[in-house]
């Protein structure tokens, strides 16, 4: 395999997982902050808020998992070699 392609794949894999984690990380922090604020305002709605928060966390985390899959494909099943 060409060393340039191998090195580029490693850099691309690092960027894929790094950039895929930034957005969901910021989104999860913001969502958790607003959920805590909502629970503080209406403690009786805690169950509904928590359920919606956990569901949204799952959707946000799936974006990071997609980035991980792309990184693993670039590392182990390199389509460019």
Curated annotation (Swiss-Prot):
It is a multi-pass membrane protein. The chain crosses the membrane at residues 7-27, 57-77. The record marks 61 as: Reversibly protonated during proton transport. Keywords: ATP synthesis, CF(0), Chloroplast, Hydrogen ion transport, Ion transport, Lipid-binding, Membrane, Plastid, Thylakoid, Transmembrane, Transmembrane helix, Transport. Gene3D superfamilies: F1F0 ATP synthase subunit C. The keyword Signal does not apply. SUPFAM superfamilies: F1F0 ATP synthase subunit C. GO terms for cellular component: chloroplast thylakoid membrane; proton-transporting ATP synthase complex; proton-transporting two-sector ATPase complex, proton-transporting domain. GO terms for molecular function: lipid binding; proton-transporting ATP synthase activity, rotational mechanism. Signal peptide: none annotated. The keyword Ligase does not apply. It is found in: Plastid, Chloroplast thylakoid membrane. It comes from the Eukaryota. InterPro entries: ATP_synth_csu_bac/chlpt, ATP_synth_F0_csu, ATP_synth_F0_csu_DDCD_BS, ATP_synth_F0_csu_sf, ATPase_proteolipid_c-like_dom, F/V-ATP_Csub_sf. Belongs to the ATPase C chain family. F(1)F(0) ATP synthase produces ATP from ADP in the presence of a proton or sodium gradient. F-type ATPases consist of two structural domains, F(1) containing the extramembraneous catalytic core and F(0) containing the membrane proton channel, linked together by a central stalk and a peripheral stalk. During catalysis, ATP synthesis in the catalytic domain of F(1) is coupled via a rotary mechanism of the central stalk subunits to proton translocation. In plastids the F-type ATPase is also known as CF(1)CF(0). F-type ATPases have 2 components, F(1) - the catalytic core - and F(0) - the membrane proton channel. F(1) has five subunits: alpha(3), beta(3), gamma(1), delta(1), epsilon(1). F(0) has four main subunits: a(1), b(1), b'(1) and c(10-14). The alpha and beta chains form an alternating ring which encloses part of the gamma chain. F(1) is attached to F(0) by a central stalk formed by the gamma and epsilon chains, while a peripheral stalk is formed by the delta, b and b' chains. This is ATP synthase subunit c, chloroplastic. The lineage of its organism: Eukaryota, Sar, Rhizaria, Cercozoa, Chlorarachniophyceae.
